[in-house]
């Protein structure tokens, strides 16, 4: 189940020029973005662990995105 609110998802889609966005479209994009976010978070956590830190920092996120 998607946890990302649907309103920002609809805004993102509408910013591309879409006039209307179906509920299914919002749900699909939200689910995909959550999956990608989880992958990035896992990798960032690994980066922090390698650096012997418990805290995930912005630089860990940036490096995780590059690694994926």
Task: Describe each region flagged by the PLM.
Residues 1-68:
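Terminal helix-to-tail segments of small alpha-helical proteins
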